[in-house]
Amino acid sequence: LAVISALATALACYPRLSLWLNRSAPVWYLEGTVFLCGIVLWGFVFAWHTPYTRRPVFLLKLELGPFVTATVAAIIASAVFDLVLDPLLRSRIPQDYPDDLEHWFAFLLFSLALTQLFLLFAPFDWLMRLLKNRWAATNLTVLFGALVLAMRIQSLPTQLPPLLFAALLTVRIVMGFLAVSFYLRGGILLIWWWTFLFEARHLLNLNE
């Protein structure tokens, strides 16, 4: 199952990797790397999520409460980014914002297939297996996401203003805790729904 999921992840990442003009390696190499890493990451999820959380990985029948909460939270987060953070970030990190529908779809698939797997599903389930403590696993997963974001920002050619950096980090931490909660209550499908709604905010600003 992990191999099949890793293959699906690699295929879903192809559009964005192929559109990445300044990539440091050929697409086939990046695809192979995603596939091999995906096997390991999905292995964490399928091997340890259900035994240590007592929750299914895929919850096909979502409960109304978590679904409504995730929907409202995604809409609020989208509004905060679209009205406050995106206008400040778009000029500084243009490569993170899609210009047209093709790029938006590629960004969406990449986020659904790999970003959530790398930042949420796999680290949380690995930490649950390692620590056997939901509180510790949640906090360390959120911390990991915050560190990745901080490293990403520090690698930019032009540094963000401290206030903007602090605001972005704070919002991401809050969203990290919400994401873990939704993952536990609704599984991967609820996180994918939350991600779709959040990424859909870009549709309002496409050139085409």
Q: Whereabouts are the PLM-identified features?
A:
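Function-critical hydrophobic alpha-helical transmembrane segments in multi-pass membrane proteins
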Residues: 96-147
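Interfacial transmembrane-helix boundary/kink motif in multi-pass membrane proteins
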Residues: 1-2, 25-34, 52-79, 137-142
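Central hydrophobic cores of alpha-helical transmembrane segments
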Residues: 4, 138-148, 189-202
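Juxtamembrane "helix-exit" motif on the non-cytosolic side of transmembrane helices
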Residues: 12-22, 83-92, 151-160
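Functionally important transmembrane alpha-helices
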Residues: 159-208
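Transmembrane alpha-helix/helix-exit interface in multi-pass inner-membrane proteins
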Residues: 72-92, 111-124
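Alpha-helical transmembrane segments in multi-pass membrane proteins
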Residues: 1-46, 104
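Short aromatic-rich membrane-water interface segments that cap or initiate transmembrane helices
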Residues: 27-33, 99-115, 170, 175-177
